[in-house]
Amino acid sequence: MNKRKHMDIRRLIISLPAIMALWGGLASCDKMIYDNYDDCPRGVYVNFYSQTECAENPSYPAEVARLNVYAFDKDGILRSANVFEDVQLSAAKEWLIPLEKDGLYTIFAWGNIDDHYNIGEIKIGETTKQQVLMRLKQDGKWATNIDGTTLWYATSPVVELKNMEDGADQYIHTRANLREYTNRVTVSVDSLPHPENYEIKLASSNGSYRFDGTVAKADSTYYPGETKVVGDSTCRAFFTTLKLESGHENTLSVTHKPTGREIFRTDLVGAILSSQYAQNINLRCINDFDIRLVAHHCNCPDDTYVVVQIWINGWLIHSYEIEL
């Protein structure tokens, strides 16, 4: 009896290396197990980080909690679509994007797409990277309120899955830089005798995005932002917007409510870029804008006020001469 037990244990010990070798072969697509590599699972591991041109080191934003990740081939056709929940970015963490075939791929990723957005139809093997991925929800001309949320976008360098028959790796690794696609904009108007009579608005045609992070053509949409009186001669409004960039009608306006007359209207991004101090306000590095407009009484037909100075993040970017 004991002799048989010893024999069974010995057989088990002898067979363990064989079992481990078999498991390792299955896990790594060993040629000893597979006749070829056609059924071998493959893919790209992606590490996500965030770093602007102005930052010395990468960061790993804690507010990124969800990732929608897409892989497109060299022809711009979608080959893999994945959603990862409860994300926690770190230098060591990677996410696997499964792929079936050898070839060149680019990874596009969006962080924090939620129920504020409508997602377009997605079909593996048909959808192109130039198609619209999502649209910010809106009611008429007003966008849904995205205060307290952030949106992020990343793209990887082109990566290549090579033929494993030639000794290539089963999986490859890359990184993708998440850039924030939301802005927080505080606008104050000073030197108004009756600040309760004025309304601040901010609109942009940036509510739709393609898979590749570019803005799709859309009508201008107003972002919610209540104008409040914050002093004897000051009113203020706060807005959370999607990415403000040149060419998309980023219109900031101030209206005198009793008459309906606009006392100020400008393309916000255009005003920044046309300023001699534009180099101090790098739109690639800044997501928070503190805008101060200084008003002055003018010799106008309706005896009202106009804006004579524009300050952004402490910089006087424009001043205007008026007839007093």
UniProtKB/Swiss-Prot annotation:
Gene3D superfamilies from the UniProt entry: 2.60.40.2090, 2.60.40.2100
PROSITE patterns membership: PROKAR_LIPOPROTEIN
Lipidation positions, renumbered (N-palmitoyl cysteine): C29
Main location class: membrane
Pfam families the UniProt entry points to: Mfa2
Lipid attachment site numbers (S-diacylglycerol cysteine): C29
Single GO BP term: pilus assembly
Signal peptide location: 1-28
Record note on disruption phenotype: Minor fimbriae are longer than normal and are easily detached from the cell by mild shear stress.
Membrane topology: Lipid-anchor
InterPro entries given in the database record: FimB/Mfa2/Mfa3 (IPR014941)
Transmembrane segments: none
Function noted in UniProt: Anchoring subunit of the minor fimbriae. Regulates fimbrial length. These filamentous pili are attached to the cell surface; they mediate biofilm formation, adhesion onto host cells and onto other bacteria that are part of the oral microbiome. Fimbriae of P.gingivalis are major virulence factors.
Extra information: The name (minor fimbrium subunit) does not indicate the abundance of the protein, but is derived from the greater length of the major fimbriae. In strain ATCC 33277 and strain ATCC BAA-1703 / FDC 381, major fimbriae are 300 - 1600 nM in length and about 5 nm in diameter. In contrast, minor fimbriae are only about 80 - 120 nm long. This length difference is observed only in a small number of strains, including strain ATCC 33277 and strain ATCC BAA-1703 / FDC 381, and is due to a loss of function mutation in FimB, a protein that restricts fimbrial length in other strains.
Quaternary context: Mfa2 is not part of the fimbrium itself, but anchors the fimbrium in the outer membrane via its interaction with Mfa1. Linear, head-to-tail oligomerization of fimbrial subunits mediates assembly of the fimbrium stalk, while the minor components Mfa3, Mfa4 and Mfa5 probably form the fimbrium tip. The anchoring subunit Mfa2 limits fimbrium length and is important for solid fimbrium attachment to the outer membrane. In its absence, the minor fimbriae become very long and are easily detached from the membrane.
Family listed: Belongs to the bacteroidetes fimbrillin superfamily. FimB/Mfa2 family.
Protein name: Minor fimbrium anchoring subunit Mfa2
Lineage: Bacteria, Pseudomonadati, Bacteroidota, Bacteroidia, Bacteroidales
